[in-house]
């Protein structure tokens, strides 16, 4: 379903945790990372499409999230010809998106990348809201920046946690991605939803939080 200008109606999702960190999914068998997104089917409202895509790509249900904002209007990006199927070239130009900002009220272990038979992601992680977008495919970066900027007005300051005495750090394991080693600090491995703190400053540097099948 395309509009008169050749853009497909679509929804994008920026999912936050309690610390205002953002969910990123690694595209299946690729090295690029992105937010959940998907087309709006005929007869669907943007909100209905958002909840469907949220479940298909992250396994989350409406009760796991709270809507805290959305973009006022459509945001558009054009897709380069090399990514467009030959039979629709000349008709299809790209996507026009309504973006939703969600707050996750469930737990990390509620996320399931295999909620459907056709998963979009094979890994996921939390990262800072304003992380550099180098690992996002190039033609989507501008619209990501626009969505993040417009929706940032809905952000609230994360709850302050009481300072705990700093003891020696334990259970550190090197992880190598490409030629670069990363360090994970396992905070609590005794619960199903274990928390992992990762020392990294950019999206590309961060190792996956969860890998499908492991």
From Swiss-Prot:
Its EC number is 3.6.1.-. Pfam families: NUDIX. Belongs to the Nudix hydrolase family. RppH subfamily. Residues 6-149 form the Nudix hydrolase domain. Its cofactor is a divalent metal cation. Accelerates the degradation of transcripts by removing pyrophosphate from the 5'-end of triphosphorylated RNA, leading to a more labile monophosphorylated state that can stimulate subsequent ribonuclease cleavage. Keywords: Hydrolase. This is RNA pyrophosphohydrolase. It is an enzyme of class 3 (hydrolase). CDD domains: NUDIX_Ap4A_hydrolase_plant_like. The lineage of its organism: Bacteria, Pseudomonadati, Pseudomonadota, Betaproteobacteria, Burkholderiales. It comes from Burkholderia cenocepacia (strain HI2424). It comes from the Bacteria. One of its GO terms (molecular function) is pyrophosphatase activity. The keyword Iron does not apply. A motif (Nudix box) lies at residues 38-59.
């Amino acid at each position: 379903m395309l509009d008169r200008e050749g853009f497909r109606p679509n929804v994008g999702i920026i999912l936050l945790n309690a610390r205002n960190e953002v969910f990123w999914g690694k595209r299946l068998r690729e090295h690029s990372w992105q937010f959940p997104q998907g087309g709006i089917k005929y007869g669907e409202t943007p909100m209905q499409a958002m909840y469907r895509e949220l479940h298909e790509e992250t396994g989350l249900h409406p009760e796991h999230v709270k809507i805290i904002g959305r973009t006022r209007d459509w945001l558009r990006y054009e897709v380069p010809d090399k990514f467009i199927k030959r039979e629709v070239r000349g008709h299809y130009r790209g996507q026009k998106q309504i973006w939703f900002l969600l707050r996750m009220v469930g737990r990390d272990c509620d996320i399931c990348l295999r909620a459907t038979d056709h998963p979009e992601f094979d890994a996921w992680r939390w990262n800072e809201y304003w992380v550099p977008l180098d690992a996002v495919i190039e033609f989507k970066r501008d619209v990501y920046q626009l969505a993040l900027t417009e929706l940032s007005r809905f952000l609230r300051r994360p709850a302050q946690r009481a300072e705990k005495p700093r003891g020696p750090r334990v259970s550190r394991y090197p992880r190598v991605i490409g030629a670069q080693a990363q360090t994970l600090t396992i905070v609590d491995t005794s619960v199903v939803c274990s928390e992992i703190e990762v020392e990294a400053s950019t999206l590309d540097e961060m190792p996956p939080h969860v890998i499908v099948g492991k």
